[in-house]
Amino acid sequence: MSRFYRLLIVLLFCGTFVSYSQQRIYPDYNSSSGFELDSLDAYDPLVLDNLETLARVWGFVKYHHPAMADTTIHIDYELFGLLPRVVHAGKAERNRILSEWINELGAFEVDTTFQQELSAIDHILINDFSWVEDTVRLGSKLSQTLSDLRYAISKSNKYVWNEGVTIKLYDDPFPNYDYNHLYDAGYRLLILFRLWNAIDSYCPNLNMT
């Protein structure tokens, strides 16, 4: 069982058994994400695989898509909209939904010049994004979109501040709940997805986690 699956099961039982889009209008998610899971979902291989795939794709888009340069897209709310559509979907349907979602965020230009220069010298990659090339899991279309997105031209990203040798990550604040408020499944998954992707994308000691 993968580290992600173990974290996911623990989380599910915590407290319960170029041209980008115009400004998005989202439902009011302040009181609830509107998404819940039941106890059986923690044992369903389809659900677990869908949630892991969604976590990876969502986080990859968060840190790579040029649409994240401003406040047009609220990436957390995008997740809340995707969860009910993806969680019980078949693999082909899931991949179609995710591929269409990325396309809806807007077109982007690709520049592989840096990668070509990097491949010509000896180097060590701290983080492994080879999973985007897994066409068995992602299908050819989604895999190609993510592979292109890896080299998308982006002037800035509101979730990542690059200050020379220092990288700072930013996330949108949670609603101001009472201290004893129990987050629903959507918000708990958001917490896990944020942590997972921050480590997977930027942790220099990933092999030790």
Predicted regions and their residues:
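Flexible, low-complexity junctional segments that flank or bridge functional domains
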Residues: S21-T209
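Bacterial Sec-dependent N-terminal signal peptides
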Residues: M1-R24
